[in-house]
Amino acid sequence: MKKWISLYDLCPVESGTCNDGTVRITAMAYLKNCPDNTQQMEKQLLRTSEYILLRGKHGGGYGGLLRDVNVCATSRITGQAIADLYTSLPKVYRQNAVFMMNAVTMNKLQCALGVYAHDWITSRRDRSLLLMNKPVMLCNAMPFIRKGSVPILFGDFSKVSIKDCGRDELQRESCNGSSDRLLCTMTGYMNCVLEDSQAIWGLKII
């Protein structure tokens, strides 16, 4: 069983108030007109906000957590690159550290390790994965392996502070004059700060 998580499973989320660093996040979806549209859009907003808090906002001033972390540069994913990432994280943060990547990156890492994969990657009793004896958290919002991307993070995510600063009411518009199908929009406001720049490191593809 692979361990699927979201950024919010790893980072403490608290209530907050809007300030100069607050990120405005809007989620949109076409939905059937039903009583649970608000709940559906709240889930959609969480998914959208996870991508933006990690990757940044296109055309906006917020660069995302992946831009804030220190990085180790590599041209490809190898065992040596993973070892360099591991040792770059100061020892004080390793006790609670986890690896975070998407499932495609994990599969490519296993292929790159080849016959030595079982020396690097092991399974726990619940069949969740360990890499270098540290938990692997698979997150759909993490980017794929490509030049310039940071597809793997390693560190103590308790040092990331996320504040939920509220959301606007659900907005609904009919599609093509039909009351059965709606364009739903919900906007939320969040702050995301890496409290300690040494607590999380990333592997950057160059």
Residue ranges and their predicted role:
Residues 63-188:
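Extended oligomerization regions of viral-like shell subunits
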Residues 2, 24, 114, 148-151, ...:
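Generic detection of intrinsically disordered/low-complexity segments and helix-coil linkers/edges
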Residues 3-9, 50, 54, 171-206:
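Protruding loop/beta-arch "assembly-hinge" segments enriched in small, turn-prone residues
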Residues 26, 30-32, 101-105, 156, ...:
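Helix N-cap / beta->alpha transition motif
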Residues 4-91, 205-206:
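Alpha-helical scaffold segments that mediate packing/assembly in large oligomeric complexes
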